[in-house]
């Protein structure tokens, strides 16, 4: 090889090294609803104030809503909600199950994506800590030039997915440098999600000493007026249920869909979970199992509202056997859903 050939070869090697060194870091941000830091009055009030002040959650005019919120709700509800949270509190970690599971989901996803050396995984809450803004800052400080943000809601609603998007972009609005962004969309019909739900139901039913006459899919409700204005949430929930029912091979008498957690005087999406549970028991149904397809992790609304309150209502009205089917949480099937959707959005960036 001549000296001229060596000189010509060297720049191409340098260029390749430089290109490899400049592979941008990509952040993956998992976001769930949120949780109070404790069950006492102070932490509960701070959490509820942030949550119930969100215009996406309560659409009433502020002149009407704020006097109710600050004059009544925040003086009475923190104590009552604190007692409910205390029933499900993770004593070992001194936190709610939602925070425990969301952290575990983040850690397991990071391990699963270890084959991508330029990917950084973190997690945040829309309300409470760690906040979306603080974790976004952390990702940027670590050199992330691109971020995949994943609102952990299978079905889209302005009250959940949209407000997470709002807060994320609000954080970016303050930045001089803004990373490229991808948002993981709702996944109410994704085969990997439907299969994970079906497998979780089948595995749970195998552990029971009874065969439920009814499997009830209970989704968090929203005011009917929101749906009437175009929120696609109800349709997406029912589509999830349709696919899940078909996968399980259950008929309409064996599988029902309902909506829970209504708040305030407005009409919410129906049928209501509590009324349906009571009605089924009074009409002779002796055994049932309830799952929450719209929640990726167990929380107050699943563990207590269904596992305790709905169970009591069913048994008090003539039912004999009741079981709550846990959410996917950080199970193998649940993590497969999250990993599959994140890997799809990472294409072209890793």
From Swiss-Prot:
Protein name: Ferrochelatase
Catalytic activity as recorded in UniProt: heme b + 2 H(+) = protoporphyrin IX + Fe(2+)
Gene Ontology, cellular component aspect: cytoplasm
Pfam families assigned to the protein according to its UniProt record, in alphabetical order: Ferrochelatase (PF00762)
Cell compartments where the protein resides: Cytoplasm
Role noted for this protein: Catalyzes the ferrous insertion into protoporphyrin IX.
UniProt KW Iron keyword: yes
Entry's Gene Ontology molecular function annotations: ferrochelatase activity; metal ion binding
Pathway the protein acts in: Porphyrin-containing compound metabolism; protoheme biosynthesis; protoheme from protoporphyrin-IX: step 1/1
Domain of life: Bacteria
Main EC class the enzyme belongs to: lyase
Lineage: Bacteria, Pseudomonadati, Pseudomonadota, Alphaproteobacteria, Hyphomicrobiales
């Amino acid at each position: 090889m001549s000296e001229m050939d060596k000189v010509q070869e060297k720049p191409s090697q340098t260029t390749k090294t430089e290109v490899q060194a400049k592979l941008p870091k990509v952040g993956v941000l998992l976001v769930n609803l949120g949780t109070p830091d404790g069950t006492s009055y102070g932490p509960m009030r701070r959490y509820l104030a942030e949550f119930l002040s969100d215009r996406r959650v309560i659409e009433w005019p502020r002149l009407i809503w704020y006097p109710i919120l600050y004059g009544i709700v925040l003086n009475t509800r923190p104590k009552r909600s604190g007692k409910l949270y205390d029933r499900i509190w993770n004593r070992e970690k001194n936190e709610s199950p939602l925070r425990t599971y969301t952290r575990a989901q983040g850690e397991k996803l990071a391990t699963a994506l270890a084959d991508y050396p330029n990917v950084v995984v973190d997690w945040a809450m829309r309300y409470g800590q760690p906040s979306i803004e603080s974790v976004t800052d952390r990702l940027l400080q670590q050199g992330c030039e691109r971020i995949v943000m994943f609102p952990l809601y299978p079905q889209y609603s302005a009250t959940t997915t949209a407000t997470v998007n709002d807060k994320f972009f609000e954080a970016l609005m303050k930045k001089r440098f803004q990373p490229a962004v991808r948002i993981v969309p709702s996944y109410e019909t994704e085969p990997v999600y439907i299969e994970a739900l079906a497998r979780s139901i089948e595995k749970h039913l195998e552990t029971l000493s009874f065969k439920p006459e009814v499997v009830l899919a209970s989704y968090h409700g929203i005011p009917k007026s929101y749906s009437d204005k175009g929120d696609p949430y109800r349709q997406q929930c029912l589509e999830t249920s349709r696919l899940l029912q078909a996968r399980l091979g259950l008929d309409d008498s064996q599988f029902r869909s309902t909506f829970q957690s209504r708040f305030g005087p407005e009409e919410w999406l129906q049928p209501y979970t509590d009324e349906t549970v009571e009605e089924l028991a009074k009409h002779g149904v002796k055994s049932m199992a309830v799952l929450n397809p719209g929640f990726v992790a167990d929380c107050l609304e699943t563990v207590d509202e269904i596992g305790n309150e709905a169970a009591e209502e069913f048994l008090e009205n003539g039912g004999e056997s009741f079981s709550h089917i846990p959410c996917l949480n950080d199970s193998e099937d649940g993590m497969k859903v999250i990993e599959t959707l994140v890997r799809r959005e990472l294409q072209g960036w890793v």
